[in-house]
């Protein structure tokens, strides 16, 4: 993988002081929350050396590298925030709205309001009066979005590992709630746990 840099942010820093990357983790799983993170790096920041030179879209990184990157991101960022929306809310308002809610909560939780939001994906509904840009594949293109993707993913993985201790039969520490063959078979044998999303139907189990 080619190392990422703050090229996109440099262009924007001419006009915006605090450029905030936002991404989520957990839209697709059958269980657990959706988690979003917001990250603002200092103006003119560049990852010249160290572990942040290895930053990329969290899906392209190993779990161990994500765990190394997360504290470095928190240390180098001007400010950051992580917010989760639980499975019950997902079932009540749907996963798209829950994802928007998590992203907005992350942006609102920052100790200093950003001047521009960079959102991974192609849609966003803001709750705060801040301009934004949506960027398809932004977690592989924009440094601050990639950083947000790592914080969101590592926090969600941590939460699912805690759930695995309460519901060990589902293997959440391995599948993070995603619909792996092992996970679907566990649902077939044991039924859904209290943290499963009831609005997500399983064709493998004949659900429609």
UniProtKB/Swiss-Prot annotation:
It is an enzyme of class 3 (hydrolase). Keywords: Cytoplasm, Endonuclease, Hydrolase, Manganese, Metal-binding, Nuclease. Its main location: cytoplasm. GO terms for biological process: DNA replication, removal of RNA primer; mismatch repair. It is found in: Cytoplasm. One of its GO terms (cellular component) is ribonuclease H2 complex. Residues 17-208 form the RNase H type-2 domain. A divalent metal cation binds at residues 23-24, 120. Its EC number is 3.1.26.4. Manganese or magnesium. Binds 1 divalent metal ion per monomer in the absence of substrate. May bind a second metal ion after substrate binding. One of its GO terms (molecular function) is RNA binding. It catalyses: Endonucleolytic cleavage to 5'-phosphomonoester. Its cofactor is Mn(2+); Mg(2+). PANTHER family: RIBONUCLEASE H2 SUBUNIT A, RIBONUCLEASE HII. Belongs to the RNase HII family. Endonuclease that specifically degrades the RNA of RNA-DNA hybrids. This is Ribonuclease HII.
């Amino acid at each position: 993988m080619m190392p990422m840099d703050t090229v996109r942010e440099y262009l924007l820093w001419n006009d915006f002081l605090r450029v905030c990357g936002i991404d989520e983790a957990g839209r697709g799983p059958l269980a657990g929350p959706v988690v979003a993170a917001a990250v603002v790096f200092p103006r003119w920041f560049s990852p010249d050396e160290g572990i942040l030179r290895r930053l990329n879209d969290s899906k392209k990184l190993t779990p161990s590298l994500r765990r190394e990157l997360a504290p470095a991101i928190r240390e180098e960022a001007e400010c950051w925030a992580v917010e989760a929306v639980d499975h019950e809310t997902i079932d009540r308002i749907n996963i798209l709205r829950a994802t928007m809610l998590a992203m907005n909560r992350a942006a609102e939780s920052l100790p200093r309001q950003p001047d521009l939001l960079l959102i991974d994906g192609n849609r966003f509904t803001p709750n705060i009066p801040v301009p934004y840009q949506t960027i398809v594949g932004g977690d592989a293109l924009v440094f601050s979005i990639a950083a947000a993707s790592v914080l969101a993913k590592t926090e969600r993985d941590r939460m699912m590992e805690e759930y695995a201790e309460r519901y060990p039969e589902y293997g959440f520490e391995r599948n993070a709630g995603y619909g792996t063959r092992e996970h679907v078979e566990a649902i077939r044998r044991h039924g859904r746990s209290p943290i499963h999303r009831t609005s997500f139907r399983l064709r493998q189990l004949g659900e429609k």
